[in-house]
Amino acid sequence: MKDEQLYYFEKSPVFKAMMHFSLPMMIGTLLSVIYGILNIYFIGFLEDSHMISAISLTLPVFAILMGLGNLFDVGAGTYISRLLGAKDYSKSKFVSSFSIYGGIALGLIVILVALPFSDQIAAILGARGETLALTSNYLKVMFLSAPFVILFFILEQFARAIGAPMISMIGMLASVSLNIILDPILIFGFDLNVVGAALGTAISNVAAALFFIIYFMKNSDVVSVNIKLAKPNKEMLSEIFKIGIPAFLMSILMGFTGLVLNLFLAHYGNFAIASYGISFRLVQFPELIIMGLCEGVVPLIAYNFMSNKGRMKDVIKAVIMSIGVIFVVCMIAVFTIGHHMVGLFTTDQAIVEMATFILKVTMTSLLLNGIGFLFTGMLQATGQGRGATIMAILQGVVIIPVLFIMNALFGLTGVMWSLLIAESLCALAAMLIVYLLRDRLTVDTSELIEG
């Protein structure tokens, strides 16, 4: 490993190390928001609601592809960081090689299984009439690019795992920039419409994956793309998938709960959907910053779990303090200028009032959400597969019974408060799990919970 990477893992001041790993990830998560709206933005110029609907309907499929990537990227990434902390550099080559080619194989399976049924999958997603063919065509490009999409997720995670978060950010930035260039050319220049939007995203993922491959081939002695090293054993599979499977479940279940929430909101009409949509966009930015902070330090926690548990404890404390500062700043902003923030999106006073209320509720849950992110990342980093699995399931399903109960008791207001209640339950569960596993973590995590 390079001396600079070792410096941030082992010797730099804790806050400096935290920012080194987290800042690129924060920027990367914000870029993912831009990435998600680019296609709809450009397609919007065509003023065809069917095309916009087609792209929106494919979001669950992208979430599934991301979840499939998580099988390898989160599990193998945290395992590699732990191996580096234990100075076992040779084993990390075998882990990375297996994960890279395992991810490619998974993508090829997606092509074989899903591509022939693109029309049927589009119908299951809700596409009807003119939207059906458009959605199916978009899906076909997505499925064909699946190996590269999954590979992109894996390699981006590996860059952070070995202590090169700036490379991770550069790869994501290059992908988004290329997408911005390609979308108008393919959509308008070649008159490909929805297919052009899909191709722009696919080509961007291919280019980013190639960027990471070239980087690792030239600069890394701990990540290998040599297929001859892709030889898994029982220990390797256990270490990868005991964390990868919970990460996969979390992605799938979170998408499912989002669908359930939408169904409850739809019961109250466009007024409720619009109000929640505005508040969601506003709270998404601090939430993604906190998510980037928590996910960014996962390699740092994993590395020091094997080499310096006192430093690991200091990193966790620094992250908790940072989450607290972000939370306080956001709460002050929401309770002082929340109306004006919502007013940037609509002039309908009824929606402004409801969206402002929802914004206050969802922002109140930001602190608990952050604790949940951090402790889930901590369980992943330290290889606590059972705890990570429990958290993945809880974060995906707890909100569902809460939604039913609160909706029955308090209507739309209850639906909104259910978000805070569910986050509170998940945060308490995360703290309890970490407390129960404190001996395995071999650091006094009870201090972190008790203050």
UniProtKB/Swiss-Prot annotation:
Print the keywords alphabetically.
Antibiotic resistance, Cell membrane, Membrane, Transmembrane, Transmembrane helix, Transport
CC per GO annotation: plasma membrane
**Example GO BP:** response to antibiotic
Keyword hit for Membrane = yes
Q: In what way does this protein cross or attach to the membrane? A: Multi-pass membrane protein
Concerning CDD domains, the annotation shows:
MATE_MepA_like
Q: Which residues cross the membrane?
A: 26-46, 52-72, 97-117, 139-159, 170-190, 194-214, 245-265, 282-302, 318-338, 355-375, 390-410, 417-437
| Pfam families according to UniProt | MatE
Predominant location of this chain?
A: membrane
Does the record bear Transferase in its keywords?
no
What is its subcellular localisation? Cell membrane
GO molecular function, one example? antiporter activity
Q: Which domain of life is it from?
A: Bacteria
Family classification? Belongs to the multi antimicrobial extrusion (MATE) (TC 2.A.66.1) family. MepA subfamily.
Write out the function statement from the record.
Multidrug resistance efflux protein.
**The protein, known as:** Multidrug export protein MepA
* Species assigned in the record: Staphylococcus aureus (strain bovine RF122 / ET3-1)
